[in-house]
């Protein structure tokens, strides 16, 4: 009120009253408009409200629904409204000169749209301080006009109207900016306006800050054809300067979207963005993220960063989440209606006015449930389901899915040695999450020795090194390789298993981390899709437990990967300290990866970050004291990776001590005791024997490191079995045991494969170590010679087959003069000799007193022999009385010569059944049947062996005995011992030279 004194106000009122009665109708109308203009122009805010009510929108060139302003005020409270009322873009009174910008006809005409070559937006902001000065000047001029009218009696209205004429340029501040430019507008009162120029597709907008980021306030279109849209990668517009890459003009319609098959695909995108030498896991995660984006948003987007491109388009109808939301519209509306009804009943029945906090909670619950379940419709009266603000798509899903990688990457980069530390700021914003998976791939490759070549090249070609220290020989070979090489050479599978235990555990834990992360992402997606079902349950106390359980599961799946990464970092840190001491790592960025060099560098050129041990011992930032340097130099990993450097440094230090010191008055023994090298070669007691001290100390350090590594491996192996349950208990969620592969399962499977390979190798060594003789030499000769056999003078044919063996000698049992007994029948045949027993020199067999003539026909040695039993033709006389001597003699089975056997090479002979003392005929028949079954089984095994070997199962050089032949021989011996077969084995064979 100090700027508007009471006298001035009285003067204004009197002037209006005096002129109100004397002006014409036209003056009356002009006076009314002037009063409204004056009242609406007292401040920038009131002027903005007046422009909004009486004219078209002055803050933007693009008309928006009025309800949009209310929604934007919720997203950006105070800031949006303050900027909205002061911003001027569509005002022809301002933008008509060089200071504000000369736009004939106004900024918003088609001819005055923004030039894509120079995307500069002109706008102005009202300033209350300048407005007060302008209004004070108008008041002073009006007072002078009234005073003049009083003194002269003239009409003051024209002068007053001139004093209050439009002077917008006096209290508006002009601004201009291109996308990315920002600044502050200072004015009286609060808040200070923050503005930023942004580009939204084919629009350039002035924005301010809000909860969701930059909130556009006023916008202006760019000229057509718009070249910077998502079609820029393929659209062939007239002006080639507008296209980023003129050579890239594909015609495939699928190229309309960046994640289509016409592009590089998810694997290539992740591979090109990765900065590790060996890429393993990041393509898998990228493909999973793209699949989730397509499933939840639209098939036309690959990332949640592109939500704004399709949030109001029909393409969202392909989204599973959108379809479920549409189906839940009526149900969520019913929940909200019931909530409003219950709240109204509560107010009516309470009998008193509830506190304001209860009203606020009521409104916030309504907004929360609508925003996160089905979305807020930002266009009143528009029934389109696409034009909505969706909290799950725009906020919840990006936060949860990005949070999985963000939280885990914080822990992954906390390694004390600096190994595999990737900064996500060095990545593009859309793929910054790959830093976590690059760190995982880098560590797995480092512990498995997959990056030996990369590190070796960096050591030689990319870093400034001192060749006096033999740095060119250093490489990052993991210690287990030095144990694996002799284990493989010696064939000791126990050493191989011990050497591979740690890399297998690393692989199993890394695989579990990838598996757990993917399962958590899928679980979050499933729970998120069900958000329209669970979020409305927050309204009522009876169903709120379901909502809280839903939220707990979401948070649990967000945190579980971080717990797994913490376990991995702990395991890796203990391993690093055990094998590498306090060694610190440095990194070098290579602009051409090794893979690209191998491929000729045609496909892509990506940056690769290589890590190697920092051997600059004077670097106090990483090695603050001498203990840290000695801890690294004496570590097992450093000595194995840098053997020549270790020997060279030790020799150099020892020689420098000797050369740099001169003997003085001190005794010789004390003088020599000062040198580490000389004192180190003195023999001293070791653990089991006398050894040089230096050698003993090194061996002791190596053994202690191995023991600690084994102990660490044991602890981590047992803890990994409970890792899933531990992560679930930490986050109060569901364990991933049943959906993710446990680390122990992978470890046990790999160790089982090693055990199987070891057993196979051991069995092969045992077979190879057995001795034997070669095949029998084939005899030559030809005809048959008859030999007299037995008392009866019956001849036995002995036929020498070509390339063959000795003819079998067959004896048949005869009865003695007093007791019925059976004499052994000896068969010395090629089939029996080759199948059952190893070849041996032939022994003569004495025939029994009584024998029958057996005819044996043979073919070529390659023809299989079939042993046929003709014992069925022989019959026993079964009687209840003991058999007489004559019956026993006649009961002896006779071997008959089959006419077909002579022409087919069939060997016919018979077996004796076991003689029984039991006179009962039924029991005799049963026992004979059992004996016959056993005999058939043995003969079948022989026939298979003979047929398989073509008449002879040949032995390998070195005397290898087949397992099947050994089994057949064992079965035959059991039958002989049991009396089923009374034939004695003849292992003899003739060898003709």
UniProtKB/Swiss-Prot annotation:
Residues 779-904 are annotated as: Disordered. One of its GO terms (cellular component) is plasma membrane. It holds the Pfam family TrbL. GO terms for biological process: protein secretion by the type IV secretion system. Residues 866-879 have a biased composition (Basic and acidic residues). It is a multi-pass membrane protein. Belongs to the TrbL/VirB6 family. This is Uncharacterized protein RC0142. It comes from Rickettsia conorii (strain ATCC VR-613 / Malish 7).
């Amino acid at each position: 009120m100090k700027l508007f004194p009471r006298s001035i106000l009285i003067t204004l009122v009197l002037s209006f009253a005096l002129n109100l009665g004397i002006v014409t109708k036209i003056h009356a109308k002009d006076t009314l408009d002037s009063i409204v203009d004056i009242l609406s122009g007292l401040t920038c805010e009131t002027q903005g409200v007046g422009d909004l009510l009486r004219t078209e929108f002055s803050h933007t060139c693009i008309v928006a629904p009025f309800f949009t302003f209310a929604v934007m005020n919720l997203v950006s409270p105070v800031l949006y409204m303050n900027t909205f009322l002061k911003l001027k873009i569509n005002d022809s009174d301002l933008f008509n000169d060089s200071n504000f910008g000369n736009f004939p006809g106004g900024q918003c005409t088609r001819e005055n749209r923004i030039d894509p070559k120079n995307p500069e937006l002109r706008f102005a902001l009202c300033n209350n301080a300048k407005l007060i000065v302008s209004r004070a000047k108008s008041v002073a001029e009006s007072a002078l006009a009234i005073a003049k009218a009083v003194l002269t009696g003239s009409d003051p209205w024209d002068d007053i109207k001139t004093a209050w004429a439009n002077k917008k340029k006096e209290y508006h501040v002009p601004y201009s900016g291109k996308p990315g430019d920002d600044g502050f507008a200072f004015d009286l009162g609060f808040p200070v306006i923050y503005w930023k120029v942004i580009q939204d597709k084919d629009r350039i907008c002035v924005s301010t800050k809000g909860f969701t980021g930059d909130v556009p306030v006023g916008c202006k279109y760019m000229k057509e054809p718009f070249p910077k849209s998502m079609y820029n990668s393929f659209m062939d517009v007239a002006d080639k300067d507008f296209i980023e890459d003129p050579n890239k003009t594909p015609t495939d319609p699928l190229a309309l979207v960046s994640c289509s098959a016409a592009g590089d695909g998810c694997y290539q995108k992740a591979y090109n963005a990765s900065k590790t030498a060996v890429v393993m896991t990041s393509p898998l995660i990228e493909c999973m993220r793209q699949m989730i984006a397509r499933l939840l948003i639209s098939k036309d987007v690959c990332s949640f960063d592109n939500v704004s491109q399709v949030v109001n388009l029909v393409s969202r109808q392909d989204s599973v989440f959108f379809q479920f939301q549409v189906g839940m519209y009526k149900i969520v509306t019913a929940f909200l209606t019931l909530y409003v009804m219950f709240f109204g009943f509560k107010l009516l029945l309470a009998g008193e006015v509830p506190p304001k906090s209860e009203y606020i909670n009521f409104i916030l619950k309504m907004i929360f449930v609508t925003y996160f379940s089905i979305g807020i419709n930002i266009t009143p009266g528009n029934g389109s389901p696409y034009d909505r603000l969706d909290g799950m798509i725009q906020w919840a899903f990006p936060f949860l899915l990005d949070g999985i990688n963000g939280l885990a990457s914080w822990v992954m980069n906390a390694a004390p040695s600096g190994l595999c530390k990737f900064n996500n700021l060095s990545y593009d914003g859309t793929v910054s999450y790959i830093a976590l998976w690059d760190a995982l791939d880098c560590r797995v490759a480092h512990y498995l020795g997959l990056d030996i070549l990369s590190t070796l090249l960096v050591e030689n070609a990319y870093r400034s090194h001192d060749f006096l220290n033999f740095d060119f020989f250093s490489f990052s070979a993991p210690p287990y390789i030095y144990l694996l090489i002799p284990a493989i050479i010696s064939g000791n599978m126990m050493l191989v298993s011990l050497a591979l235990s740690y890399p297998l555990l690393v692989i199993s834990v890394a695989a579990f981390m990838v598996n757990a992360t993917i399962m958590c992402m899928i679980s979050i997606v499933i729970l998120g899709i069900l958000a329209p079902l669970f979020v409305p349950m927050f309204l009522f106390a009876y169903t709120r437990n379901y909502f809280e359980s839903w939220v707990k599961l979401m948070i649990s799946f967000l945190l579980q990967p971080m717990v797994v990464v913490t376990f991995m970092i702990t395991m890796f840190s203990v391993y690093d300290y055990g094998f590498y001491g306090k060694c610190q790592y440095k990194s070098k960025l290579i602009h051409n990866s090794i893979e690209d060099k191998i491929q000729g560098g045609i496909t892509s050129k990506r940056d690769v970050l290589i890590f190697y041990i920092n051997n600059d011992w004077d670097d106090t930032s990483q090695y603050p004291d001498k203990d840290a340097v000695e801890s690294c130099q004496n570590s097992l990993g450093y000595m194995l990776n840098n053997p020549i450097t270790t020997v060279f440094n030790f020799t150099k230090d020892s020689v420098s001590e000797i050369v740099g010191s001169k003997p003085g008055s001190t005794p010789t023994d004390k003088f020599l005791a000062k040198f580490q090298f000389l004192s180190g070669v003195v023999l001293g007691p070791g653990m089991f024997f006398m050894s040089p001290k230096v050698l003993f100390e090194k061996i002791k350090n190596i053994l202690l490191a191995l023991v600690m590594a084994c102990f660490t491996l044991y602890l981590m192996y047992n803890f990994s079995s409970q890792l899933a349950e531990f992560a679930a208990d930490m986050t109060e969620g569901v364990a991933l045991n049943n959906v993710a592969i446990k680390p122990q399962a992978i470890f046990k499977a790999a160790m089982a494969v090693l055990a199987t390979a070891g057993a196979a190798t051991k069995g092969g060594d045992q077979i190879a170590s057995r001795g034997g003789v070669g095949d029998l030499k084939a005899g030559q000769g030809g005809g048959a010679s008859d030999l007299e056999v037995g008392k009866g003078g019956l001849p036995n044919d002995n036929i020498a087959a070509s390339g063959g063996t000795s003819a079998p000698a067959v004896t048949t049992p005869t009865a003695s003069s007093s007791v019925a007994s059976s004499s052994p029948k000896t068969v010395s045949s090629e089939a029996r000799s080759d199948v059952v027993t190893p070849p041996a020199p032939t022994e003569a067999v004495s025939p029994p007193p009584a024998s029958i003539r057996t005819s044996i026909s043979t073919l070529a040695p390659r023809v299989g022999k079939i042993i046929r039993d003709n014992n069925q033709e022989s019959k026993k006389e079964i009687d209840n009385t003991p058999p007489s001597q004559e019956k026993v003699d006649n009961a002896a089975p006779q071997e008959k010569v089959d006419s077909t056997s002579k022409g087919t090479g069939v060997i016919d002979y018979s077996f004796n059944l076991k003689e029984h003392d039991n006179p009962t005929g039924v029991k005799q028949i049963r026992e004979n049947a059992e004996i016959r079954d056993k005999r058939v089984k043995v003969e079948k095994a022989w026939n298979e062996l003979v047929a398989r070997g073509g008449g002879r199962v040949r032995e390998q050089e070195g005397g290898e005995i087949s397992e099947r032949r050994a089994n057949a021989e064992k079965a035959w011996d059991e039958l002989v011992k049991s009396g089923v077969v009374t034939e004695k084995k003849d292992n003899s064979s003739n060898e003709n030279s």
